[in-house]
């Protein structure tokens, strides 16, 4: 695997923390997720006993750490409500499925942890930082700007075939 993949993936958490230092927290969350989704490599690092380390998990871990460091009071503003119930069920579903299928508690808890990192953490961070119309407006504007930035890359790939991921990260 290309060394740039390791640099980008394991340097992402410090970058997100640095971003929180210089940009308002809400903007840092939005920028972190958009840049990660558009530009980080599609790769999974498997660590025994832990959820896979992907671009989304790296972003979530970075935002959680940055929130603990720079915006710890934000956690106290979160209140679990009825609208959060579907996500809670979605994150806990693998446990029931694993036990029902005879795979055991360990496999079920592992799947719950993976599901929570993949879906629950982004949801939770969105609820923490984007829980009002102003936050959603900023998110929509930044997604639009991210799309505009991505257009030249899409045009290049239309002409040259999907090559940018291979060029930068060494695989597709």
Located regions from the model:
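Short, hydrophobic transmembrane alpha-helix segments
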Residues: 1-3, 14-26, 42-52, 73-74
């Amino acid at each position: 695997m290309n060394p740039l993949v390791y640099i980008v993936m394991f340097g992402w958490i410090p970058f997100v923390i640095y971003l929180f230092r210089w940009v308002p927290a809400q903007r840092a969350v939005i920028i972190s997720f958009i840049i990660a989704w558009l530009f980080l490599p599609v790769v999974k690092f498997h660590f025994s006993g832990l959820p896979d380390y992907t671009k989304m998990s790296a972003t979530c871990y970075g935002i959680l750490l940055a929130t603990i460091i720079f915006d710890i009071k934000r956690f106290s503003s979160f209140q679990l409500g009825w609208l959060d119930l579907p996500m809670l069920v979605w994150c806990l579903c693998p446990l029931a499925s694993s036990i029902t299928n005879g795979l055991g508690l360990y496999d079920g808890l592992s799947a719950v942890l993976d599901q929570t990192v993949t879906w629950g953490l982004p949801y939770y961070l969105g609820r923490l930082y984007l829980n009002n119309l102003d936050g959603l407006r900023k998110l929509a504007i930044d997604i639009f700007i991210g799309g505009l930035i991505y257009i030249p890359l899409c045009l290049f790939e239309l002409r040259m075939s999907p090559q940018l991921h291979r060029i930068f990260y060494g695989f597709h």
